[in-house]
Amino acid sequence: MKILIFAFLANLAKAQEGCGIISRKPQPKMAQVSSSRRGVYYNDDIFRSDVLHLTQDYFLPFDSNLTQYFSLNVDSDRYTYFDNPILDFGDGVYFAATEKSNVIRGWIFGSSFDNTTQSAVIVNNSTHIIIRVCNFNLCKEPMYTVSRGTQQNAWVYQSAFNCTYDRVEKSFQLDTTPKTGNFKDLREYVFKNRDGFLSVYQTYTAVNLPRGLPTGFSVLKPILKLPFGINITSYRVVMAMFSQTTSNFLPESAAYYVGNLKYSTFMLRFNENGTITDAVDCSQNPLAELKCTIKNFNVDKGIYQTSNFRVSPTQEVIRFPNITNRCPFDKVFNATRFPNVYAWERTKISDCVADYTVLYNSTSFSTFKCYGVSPSKLIDLCFTSVYADTFLIRSSEVRQVAPGETGVIADYNYKLPDDFTGCVIAWNTAKHDTGNYYYRSHRKTKLKPFERDLSSDDGNGVYTLSTYDFNPNVPVAYQATRVVVLSFELLNAPATVCGPKLSTELVKNQCVNFNFNGLKGTGVLTSSSKRFQSFQQFGRDTSDFTDSVRDPQTLEILDISPCSFGGVSVITPGTNASSEVAVLYQDVNCTDVPTAIRADQLTPAWRVYSTGVNVFQTQAGCLIGAEHVNASYECDIPIGAGICASYHTASVLRSTGQKSIVAYTMSLGAENSIAYANNSIAIPTNFSISVTTEVMPVSMAKTAVDCTMYICGDSLECSNLLLQYGSFCTQLNRALTGIAIEQDKNTQEVFAQVKQMYKTPAIKDFGGFNFSQILPDPSKPTKRSFIEDLLFNKVTLADAGFMKQYGDCLGDVSARDLICAQKFNGLTVLPPLLTDEMVAAYTAALVSGTATAGWTFGAGAALQIPFAMQMAYRFNGIGVTQNVLYENQKLIANQFNSAIGKIQESLSSTASALGKLQDVVNQNAQALNTLVKQLSSNFGAISSVLNDILSRLDKVEAEVQIDRLITGRLQSLQTYVTQQLIRAAEIRASANLAATKMSECVLGQSKRVDFCGKGYHLMSFPQSAPHGVVFLHVTYVPSQEKNFTTAPAICHEGKAYFPREGVFVSNGTSWFITQRNFYSPQLITTDNTFVSGNCDVVIGIINNTVYDPLQPELDSFKEELDKYFKNHTSPDVDLGDISGINASVVNIQKEIDRLNEVAKNLNESLIDLQELGKYEQYIKWPWYVWLGFIAGLIAIVMVTILLCCMTSCCSCLKGACSCGSCCKFDEDDSEPVLKGVKLHYT
């Protein structure tokens, strides 16, 4: 087949060269191609950096089907395509073209594609980009032609007029020479028409493709925003044809792929330069939705709640009584004469089908107003009876025939009740009703609703009737007007008047839309055991909701229950393991899943699954996508109701080699464990040392909310209206205050479990001597005296071989602590002592890192690294110095060095644990952030919204709208406070547990397995952390186990013997008794057993009652409204500079310092634990011991000298010691001594 082109050269204004005709054009093949992850674009003008952004806009869904169109010429005669049909624009278009010869030249956008409406042309004529919006006479086959590599004809449109936009871009030269080989160019575009602007996004990729659209990820950037202001419903592509002559043009190879945008949610990842580097289509599959729900591209193993679903109705059930008679409305409306208004007449209509559409569609009625019911809904309703009241009044008096009206007619002739349910119909009958008609002009008392007074006087002979003189020549306001008032009696008895709706079959036990006598709803209908009275049509529950109905045809009573509704949970092994997921439809039968839809009534394809081997019912709901194994194993991912899931291979659970998510029943023991089967247990025979890190939060940040500023901003009108809400705001802050008090109480109670430090008595003045410069100040227990600092600042520890080198490196500079870390047997270690300067430095770094992490985008968290490192190094130091724990357990001692590696591995999780604790701290800020986002997205800027309302509406309507905003904000605040209360309860429970562990694990040695770490407890060390405590538990865990046959008791001579401590085990030939946590067999004696009862086995059944969750009673709002919505006055509040939310930061530096000191003293107080090893710690004598020691020496010397002198045994040491008179050798003691003369003896 060959394509022939004929040119029609029309000499029109603004005409191009004419148009061409294509002969024998085949229909497009329209093959489908996957879009993969292409077509993402920058949908707004906001610059974002290093952030994940959730946005809702019109995007091309990932992996959607694109339609392929060709410009193709194969063998010149047989396969020739030039596909340029008119395509649907929809909500936007994704367009991708693969080519090599510049075949694609542009597009035409419009609606009718004729000269009656404007169209937009965006084309490349090989030298310019031309953009025009006009009324075009478009060519049937718009195209460009290229002859011998040169642009020849522009056959796009013949003429144009009424142009409103005309733009020509800068000139260039397009290569129009046909090329051979593979496709070299991939150009992608996105077109969106919003608010009169056509936005164009584009990206270019160099390719080398023989065919098809490449897979991958692409991001398009904005290039044009054109203010066309036209309606765009369709578009078509403008392409070029080629020839070596001036005729017989043929297409060159090119392909383009199109798809429509859909409104969806995408999560975009921006790098630090503001570039989109990745994206997730949140509705693509369960894993994608999960990523958007947790706002993270990486998902850890577990089960996550994503969204809600509701089972959609499958059928519609309409049940009306079997009534065929037509209601006689024609007799009422077409009566020959209508009565006087004071003597109005009533007609009862029953046992008939009422076609109200004839009435409210009639154009002859001047008034058709309904109260308590919509005219368009009457066709779906049934009533016990309908009453038609008729009378004649003036046209101007029709307004008085309405609830709550006053006037001569409403007060003295015809009165409607305030709760009137019905319709008022009136029409002008000036030509038909003429003459005198009467009405009552006055009366002693006003009429009651539907009261009729036929008297003509007031009882005292005074005439009360006046006359209408109707004729067609008076003004319209005084002309005769007929009025029919239809009063509807609501169903309190069987329906007798229904709309002309055809009844359908009754469908039970399925989710359906139902209509019983006008009662509409959605639910499941089931047979009921209730009994109705003969007149009763509906049944109500304690909350006054309709929960049962009588079928008007069979008179059967039916219960109404809601259709299945619940959450959708996604089970994932973690994105690092697999992208495979399973989906749990909570509390729903699998038979309902194919019709399950999301709460917003959308039906993504992934929601609908076909039944098969990977669909099975559990008590938790319908699980889809996981293979069910009929066995019990240790739980990996708990799903609920005793069902667990794992990501396993064939060697573990399955019969094939492929990994898959496997669901199974939860077991108490490990897989194939003999410890829980066949009367056998596993008893440890060997152990290894392990260290477990445990983080226990005990408090959280305190917050308060400035309710008025947060809800109303600077709007005085809103603030005044907020006063009518009573004590809502006060109660919110009262709850937050209670949370803050609870946090202080938690902290106090946790630290109260720690033993108080030993305090020395206050000794400042003793025996008249002032010791204030020598003895420490008892009011400052952490400060040493000058002499203490000078003489006694060292502690002697057992050196495993690294402490001396550390001390030589450290010198007197505490800041070199980490730098001086030593290597010991391949491990980095530090001495297990911290000076006060070191404690202060590390604590400050930790607190600063945690506090600044929130506003430094995580960079501040780097300050926490030294804290984690020194903690790990010091515990390495503790480990290597404890070279002998048990001399009678040589194997444990020998394996200690290998266990140090495990300790290091365990301590590597400390940073992660602290990160979790940081999450506890930041959850409050996150809740506030969520609250702000919720209010921002739902209500916009507070002040601008309120001011806009006040400017557009009158006072009453404005207060109604502001009231809605206040209600929404109060609800958000209430949600936030509820989250805080829940979190506070969790923190309280954690604080209680931390206090217990402080007592049992730190101050003692717990006998509970896995309570203080994983395994059997040896010792624990607390470390302070923001808003919590970090415990490092040293435990020994079984490294080898052996299975033994066991029995709970031994029956001997009709009596049952039970072990006092431990269990009975058998080695195959004999029975022994051994400890449960370590195999140490002993002979069974009366010392380790006791006798109780006989050998009979008594089986008891515990209470297994399962209580249904309580249904809250929905009481009337009246009491609540009476309590809060009341007249309330208050002086104006000066808000000043009070911020909207006061998210205060609690400074617990003193508590952290205190915890450091307490932890140190606790470690020193574990005297009983020193018996476990050979670790020795020598403390130098205090200064007062040294003083006493020196004083004693001095006293001994003085006493010795005195004795020597008194006993004349002084040797004088050749004159070095002069003893005075005690060394004289004069025998005459009576010789006088001359004053001033010194005597010498020889």
Swiss-Prot record:
What are the cysteine partners in each disulfide bond? 19-139, 134-163, 282-292, 327-352, 370-423, 382-498, 809-820
Q: Where are the transmembrane segments?
A: 1183-1203
Membrane topology field: Single-pass type I membrane protein
Which stretches does the entry tag as region Fusion peptide 2? 804-824
Region (Heptad repeat 2) spans which residues?
1132-1171
Decide whether keyword Disulfide bond is in the record: yes
| Region feature (Heptad repeat 1) | 889-939
Q: Which UniProt keywords apply?
A: Coiled coil, Disulfide bond, Fusion of virus membrane with host endosomal membrane, Fusion of virus membrane with host membrane, Glycoprotein, Host cell membrane, Host membrane, Host-virus interaction, Lipoprotein, Membrane, Palmitate, Signal, Transmembrane, Transmembrane helix, Viral attachment to host cell, Viral envelope protein, Viral penetration into host cytoplasm, Virion, Virulence, Virus entry into host cell
Q: Where in the cell is it found?
A: Virion membrane; Host endoplasmic reticulum-Golgi intermediate compartment membrane; Host cell membrane
PTMs?
Specific enzymatic cleavages in vivo yield mature proteins. The precursor is processed into S1 and S2 by host cell furin or another cellular protease to yield the mature S1 and S2 proteins. Additionally, a second cleavage leads to the release of a fusion peptide after viral attachment to host cell receptor. The cytoplasmic Cys-rich domain is palmitoylated. Spike glycoprotein is digested within host endosomes.
Alphabetical list of SUPFAM superfamilies matching this protein = Coronavirus S2 glycoprotein, SARS receptor-binding domain-like
Q: What is known of its domains?
A: Fusion peptide 1 (FP1) and fusion peptide 2 (FP2) function cooperatively and have a membrane-ordering effect on lipid headgroups and shallow hydrophobic regions of target bilayers. They are considered as two domains of an extended, bipartite FP. The membrane-ordering activity is calcium-dependent and also dependent on correct folding, which is maintained by an internal disulfide bond in FP2.
The record describes its quaternary structure and partners as: Homotrimer; each monomer consists of a S1 and a S2 subunit. The resulting peplomers protrude from the virus surface as spikes.
As a miscellaneous remark, the entry gives: Bat coronavirus HKU3 is highly similar to SARS-CoV (SARS-like).
Official protein name in the record: Spike glycoprotein
**What is the gene name?**
S
